[in-house]
């Protein structure tokens, strides 16, 4: 392949050189003998000789011209002879076996050319405007190296996927895609070296924001049972009344090292849940937790809830880049799934866990395997869960592999295991390895012993740009199953989120429609009383961190869906309408629950660096075991975010 590429390059070079010589006029022939210099002994001045018309007379070498020689002559103009134009040289944008070298735009900067990148960078938070922009480019048929189901992305991996698609975007007739590309590259400008100089130190405030959220009416804040009025919000506190948060984030990058801190002050007023005793009794029976409870529990919002005024680290981690991996420690976002409204395995519905992460941030080609499955990315993390009482202090680890066999299709396998806990099994290297590698069914005596491999949840997902309409329609599926090797092996027992996105409505190209349906209540006898998906018999608070489901907000034994209609004003501005519906099974929550939400959202920029995000939501919900009749609440939110430019310097020579 390399020899063929070298021969192709040499042939192109020879062709270009021969064409250049063919278009260069021939020089006049040199005289056979130069006349002697007048200063030499016996030399005489040269005598001019007549020349044919249409040629240039020769000038004597080093001779002193006489006045007669200095008289101007007017030769006839020379008419250039047209040279035949060679065939155009077309180099493909992507390597092929016939042409292994990809094309670059004219005068391409160095950073566009592929090469080894040893520098590290911080992750972009999953609630950033960057992800809707990247997703829109992906669903328009660009960003062939984007892994939709594995978020977040680092700043540099985002830059690489954008540069890999730059020529396709720039040479397309899609002006909206070009605008999105320009805004994203401006966001990442600190990562882009100038000329041949590598990026040096990058530091500064990444964002600063304040949010005012007023809620009028009774709310739901019970992720593990009845439902949530506010979801996918990092498990932040909220109650009826005025809720306020203000925060900032900082980024520091130098060579392979990076540091990111995002902290915020949060305020939520006091509230009262007042779950009736019959409801608490039934929920505790289904959860297999003794009632009355020994003390406050995060999964049961009961009694008077005090006002909350914490300062909390939303994200905080240090990382080092090693051979295409980010190895990090701390609190980092995770959104493992292709869905827009939720992710079955991991989302930002709950507070992030403190964990050790190993993330392959750049696609990896594995010999032989990648010929069949395409480039692969993988992610692993392990950390401790908080807010658990039965059992206290369990740990969790997650492993994911995602493949792209074609530019239109991505699929992934993921596995989460919750193991250990006070009084059950110690968290040691031995118990970790046992939980990591064990895929066998677990008998009751083993489950309740120190050899318990843990609660195992397996996920399978894919995204597919549909044939013939790949620039318009994207199909996604995300599934999870409890105690199965993979949802593919037991599809009837799995929970699903599936949907379709229409990126451009015919006649209104900036209008986008997205619909997703979700269920955690499969039609099997095992799904009863909430004791299946997101639940576990040993770690009884199940798939939660500080009381909130870590996966999809739909929760346990429920069905629902979401729909979004979005009009894109620009690359980072939009108007969006959303509808949400959820129904919880009656055998889990007595009488069941029903939620309907209608939401209008506007994201607008003032200048380049100030973003306004304002939205209004109406919710009507029914939970007869909690409150009789239809309950209504309205939420109005205004958030201002400032995105200052990071300071950056070139690397030292």
Residue ranges and their predicted role:
Residues 21-240, 249-255, 652-653:
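N-terminal periplasmic/intermembrane-space "pro-region" immediately following the signal or transit peptide
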